[in-house]
Design a protein with these regions (language model features):
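N-linked glycosylation sequons
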Residues: 1-300
Length: 300
């Protein structure tokens, strides 16, 4: 089987037969209950057919195995593992009214990078967290103290991945849901700076980004700096050529917090314009926990 958007595509291979044939695949939960079904239709002489299971995220993530109806033996059963779980991603911009503005909106590049690979959700923080969610991305969005901070802290502690992007708002109002304390914003190559824009260093071993090629054309013109500390080095997943952090991360409870020290737009860097941006986000989503479906849904 392979995933494609909200679909699970299953291929059936057989020896050729002289007449058209049909077969049925049944998706079952770990308790054996049927959750969905689809049909293969093969023409006379065909050796291969495909069935498509259209599954909402909460149901798809409960599928434990696929059975070929009426058949027995190992060739008629496929067990699904974590790779086939859908990972819903919530998006929260710093400014909702301009979030989708082409080229400059907080979510413009994020949505284009992730839409082909993840189920994206947009809503308030409260409503996003009311449903099972693997990843929540905050684009230059400080967290309000009180109920919102408590809810996001609980989301991370219970296994969620919180990805944050820096910006002027976060630099001005940092909060406690960051992997490292922030010090200040640094501008590179500006009229008041003698420093030139920085390139990216190779990703360190042990980073989820290790092995990804670093494009020479990506440069960083502004970033938020981290407070120096004894544990800073172990929390850096990506650096600039001068050694300062580009991405930091920290485990909290069962989950983790990841911070890009630049914006999710091209205002502070060329990173969102590059294919590397897509690859980095895909690796972070793949690191997250697939959500479990809710009980009570029956046959589709």
């Amino acid at each position: 089987p392979r995933t494609e958007g909200d679909s699970l595509r299953v291929t059936l291979r057989q020896s050729p037969v002289g007449a058209p044939s049909e077969a049925q695949v049944i998706a079952r939960g770990q308790d054996g209950r049927a959750l969905a079904q689809a049909e293969f239709r093969l023409a006379a002489g065909a050796t291969e057919g495909e069935a498509v299971l259209e599954l909402p995220t909460e149901i798809r993530n409960r599928v434990f195995r696929l059975d070929l109806a009426g058949e027995a033996g190992p060739g008629a059963v496929v067990l699904l593992d974590e790779r086939f779980r859908r990972r819903p991603v919530g998006l929260l911009p710093g400014a909702e009214e301009t979030a989708d503005t082409p080229l400059i909106g907080d979510l413009f590049y994020l949505e284009r990078a992730l839409a082909p690979y993840a189920e994206l959700r947009r809503d308030t923080a409260e409503r996003l967290l009311a449903r099972p969610l693997s990843v929540l991305i905050l684009a230059d969005r400080p967290i309000a103290p009180g109920a919102e901070l408590d809810a996001l802290t609980r989301f991370v502690n219970e296994g969620g991945t919180l990805i944050r992007f820096a910006g002027a708002r976060l630099a001005e109002r940092p909060d406690t849901l960051l992997p490292v304390p922030l010090r200040a914003e640094r501008q590179l190559g500006g009229a008041l700076s003698w420093e030139q824009p920085q390139r990216l260093a190779a990703f360190p071993e042990g980073s989820p980004f290790a092995g990804l090629p670093v494009p020479a054309e990506v440069s960083i013109s502004r970033q938020v700096l981290a407070e120096p500390s004894a544990r800073l080095a172990e929390r850096i997943w990506a650096r600039l050529a001068d050694g300062t952090p580009l991405v930091t991360a920290e485990s909290r409870g069962e989950g983790r917090i990841v911070l890009f020290h630049v914006t999710a737009t091209a205002e502070w860097s060329d990173l969102p314009l590059s294919g590397l941006f897509v690859q980095m986000l895909r690796r972070l989503v793949a690191l997250s926990a697939g959500v479990s479906g809710q009980e009570g849904e029956g046959m589709l």
